[in-house]
Regions:
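Short, flexible, surface-exposed loop segments at domain boundaries
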Residues: 2-9, 22, 26-209
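Sec-dependent N-terminal signal peptides
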Residues: 11-20
């Protein structure tokens, strides 16, 4: 299915509450058997949610104890500075590695998904979650050196690159019309997600990852 794709990334740390603050999301938030869903909340009936994917498919989920929810709100290039921990989907072109989007992680989420691995936002894209070691400003944006366990990478962030951060959210933020990014575990026929991580855009924000 378009925009729904397996990705070999890490497992959520479990927690007791269904709807939790970001302080409980400090461990890796991706599950090894997860798929990615990008789309819009089509309907909500109690805990049952239907997502219309960007590819036009419907996929369902029931929000319960196996789900973790985070809000997504705008950030800016000025937030990408030395010492912060970020995640960026990026692609390599003739000029180097170019950011497709950037997530500035709150300090309490430092270390989330650390590393550099394949991603499915664009063909041949990667996700790099790492500490910002150096930034170089220019009229074309900012070039950042990212350091993670076992390696480092230099990525250019253009002024037009979507930049966001995570905020606290609850089930009430998952409402019709909200944009979402989901890393979830599918049932055998792929029509339902049974557990995972749901990032919901707040105040009209689209999760860019």
């Amino acid at each position: 299915m378009e925009n729904i794709m397996k990705n070999p990334i890490r497992r959520l740390r479990s927690g007791a509450a269904a709807f939790i603050t970001l302080s409980c999301l400090t461990g890796p938030v991706w599950a090894a058997d997860s798929i990615h869903v990008r789309g819009t909340v089509a309907s909500v009936e109690g805990s049952a949610v239907t997502i219309k994917t960007n590819g036009g498919k419907d996929i369902g989920l029931t929000i319960g104890d196996d789900w973790r929810i985070a809000g997504v709100v705008p950030a800016s290039l000025s937030d990408v500075k030395k010492g912060v921990f970020i995640g960026t989907a990026n692609v390599q072109d003739s000029s180097g590695n170019r950011a497709l989007e950037v997530v500035v992680f709150p300090e309490k989420m430092r270390g989330t998904g650390e590393g550099d691995y394949g991603w499915d936002l664009k063909p041949k894209s990667s996700m790099t979650n790492a500490n910002v070691e150096q930034t170089v400003e220019s009229v074309d944006g900012s070039t950042v050196t990212l350091k993670y366990k076992g390696g480092e990478k230099t990525v250019t962030i253009a002024p037009s690159t979507p930049i966001v951060t995570f905020a606290d959210a609850t089930k009430d933020d998952v409402k019709p019309g909200a944009k979402v990014f989901i890393s979830g575990t599918p049932n055998p026929d792929g029509t339902m997600l049974t557990k995972g991580f749901l990032a919901v855009g707040k105040d009209g924000t689209t999760p860019p990852m």
